[in-house]
A protein has these predicted regions:
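Short pre-active-site segment immediately N-terminal to the catalytic Zn-binding motif
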Residues: 83-93
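Short hydrophobic/aromatic residue motifs in ordered secondary structure
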Residues: 43, 100-101
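Conserved C-terminal "switch" segment of AAA+ ATPases
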Residues: 1-69, 74, 78-79, 152-160, ...
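A short alpha-helix capping/helix-coil boundary motif
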Residues: 11, 81, 225-228
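Short, flexible loop/turn segments with low-complexity composition
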Residues: 24-25, 65, 88, 275-283
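Soluble catalytic regions of large protease machineries
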Residues: 92-96, 102-319
């Protein structure tokens, strides 16, 4: 469903829940629909169920917005695995890896807006996690796809720059960009040497709709595109090496950082048009200011600890 469809679905699932007295159902449904692009109807129902379970585990008298935010994280990325203890060296590597993704996304115009970064292990294999707020697009330009590839490669390039070595943590990233590079060259007609052709096929299929010679050219162009994006990502992060270090150090200190933390460290994203995350956070700030007269803000230390309060956060395969 689109954003209006998600909002309507949330209205249905919010009705039977015991919400905190200061929660406006209409505003909450609007906010949750903004935070859940790409979610199915079943996913939206799971968010509401998880929010109720989280509130029960925390022995909260009612469900508030923070419980829904934690529920979205859990649906996206799975359970926190604090029992999975990383060595100091591994934790540092994960922090710089995630910082590389975050800084890349911050300085690429078409990258998905960042909401939160975590180095708390989650789910089955994820050692780090980033939550983004992608725009609901139906068409993608070459520039948008290339920026997405650069952000995905940011973790591996950060490891190369800071440690002079690479780890297996980037395997999922490499799989994603290789598949995207293949689609750009073989399906979207965005490669000059192959021309405006589209070979819609599964990479694993035994029968290819092109000749062996074209297959060799396709392999060559996919590799060339990945290397071009790698060089661009290296140039970007080399110019922002100090920023990567700032973000990584804060991650090691707090384990979870938000978009507000990124703004404090790096300044606002250097692009004229506000993205969805900016608009969402501006709206969130206005709502918070409206409620200040009726309820005092939580203590600062509580704000910093909030991402760790529940045993339910979200997880995405390490970018």
């Amino acid at each position: 469903p689109d954003i209006s469809g998600r909002c309507a679905i949330f209205h249905v699932h919010l009705k039977p829940l015991k919400l905190a007295s200061d929660v406006n159902t209409d505003l909450l449904a609007e906010k949750l629909s903004t935070l859940t692009p790409g979610f199915s109807g079943a996913d939206l129902a799971n968010v509401c169920n998880e929010a109720a379970l989280i509130a029960a585990r925390l022995e909260a008298p009612a469900i508030d917005e923070s419980h829904f935010e934690l529920a979205i994280e859990r649906v996206i990325a799975g359970l926190e695995r604090k029992s999975r203890v990383l060595s100091p060296e591994e934790k540092t590597t994960v922090a710089y890896h995630e910082a590389g993704h975050a800084v890349c996304g911050w300085f690429l115009e078409y990258a998905d807006p960042l909401l939160k970064v975590s180095i708390i292990p989650r789910g089955v294999g994820a050692l780090g996690y980033a939550q983004y707020l992608p725009k609901e697009r139906y068409l993608f330009s070459t520039e948008q796809l290339h920026d997405r590839m650069c952000m995905t490669l940011g973790g591996r390039v950060s490891e190369e720059l800071f440690f002079g070595r690479i780890t297996t943590g980037a395997q999922d990233d490499l799989s994603k960009i290789t598949r995207l590079a293949f689609e750009i060259c073989a399906s979207y007609g965005m490669n000059d040497k192959l021309g405006p052709v589209s070979y819609r096929t599964e990479q694993e299929s035994m029968h290819k709709p092109y000749s062996e010679r074209t297959g060799e050219l396709l392999d060559e162009q996919v590799r060339a595109l990945v290397m071009e994006v790698h060089a661009r990502t290296t140039k970007l992060l080399t110019g922002h090496k100090a920023d990567v270090e700032k973000v990584a150090k804060l991650l090691l200190e707090r384990e979870v950082i938000t978009r507000e933390d990124m703004t404090n460290l790096l300044g606002k994203r250097p692009f004229k048009q506000a993205d969805e995350a900016d608009e969402y956070l501006d709206k969130k700030g206005r709502l918070a200011r409206k409620g200040e007269s009726s309820a005092p803000p939580p203590p600062q230390d509580e704000l910093q600890q909030d991402p760790h309060l529940a045993s339910s956060q979200s997880e995405i395969p390490p970018p």
